[in-house]
Every structure is written in C-alpha cells, then in structure tokens.
C-alpha cells in the first residue's frame, strides 16, 4: 500500500523511528512543506504526533534563505556558504534582526515581519526595505566581492538561527 505523509511529519518520522529512543521531542524546521514550516512532535513508542506548527510565510528556513540571497548566493543551494562565512564574522546585526525581522516568543514560536520580504509575493527573497535596514545593497555574486560586512551578516543570521532553535528546544 502506497501512503503519502505530510512533509514535516515525514522528516520527524525518519528522525524518530530510526533513532534509538523510545521517547523524544522532534523539531523540524525548513523552508516550507505543504504549509507548515516548523513542527514540534512528540514520539513515544510507535506513536508520533505533531503538537505544534508554524505556518508559511513565517519560516526560519526562508529567513535564512533571504540572507543567502542578500549575500549573493543561490537560494536552496548556497545556504551552506552563508553558514561557512559565519565563523569569519561577528554577529553585529543579531539584535537588529531580532528587533526588526523576527518576533521570537518565549515558547519558541515566531513571526517574520513580511514588509521586509518578497518571497511570498515576488521573484526575489528580499526588498529594498530589507537592504535599507542594513545600509547595503543585495550583493551581486558575479561582480561584487565578499566583504567583512557579508561575514558579519552571516554570523548574525547564524546566531539568530541558533537562538530560535535553542528557544524552541527549551520550551
């Protein structure tokens, strides 16, 4: 019998059922599945249940992809480059990102301020308001060099990502 599972449930199931644990909390975070972008599931024995979801357009994965685009890399394939740049920078813009772009709650839930992004309605990830926030234009990969600014932006979004995941884990 062929069965189709939801995107995030499939991620959670492949992590939980292949694990050595009888009980676990399973977090899944990525760009977007059907509509969910983030889930919290509880696994116990043979049962796995999603207990919390965050839906599109509020997505930690798409936030990271927005910074991938902003730093001049290709979305859905260049995120590892942003992660690789992060150790060379300082998270100078972490608080600005937390103040303006992502509203992170104590329970780990979050909402993105969509006025800075185009991914839900346009052909680009970010808009001019996003670039103005950091006083730098979107980097053109073929002509613009990577600078310390891009390394600091990478360190900043990496630090924000880590804070979001740790906040979710602790709640």
Task: State what each model feature region is.
Residues 1-171:
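Short acidic/glycine-rich loops and adjacent helix/strand connectors
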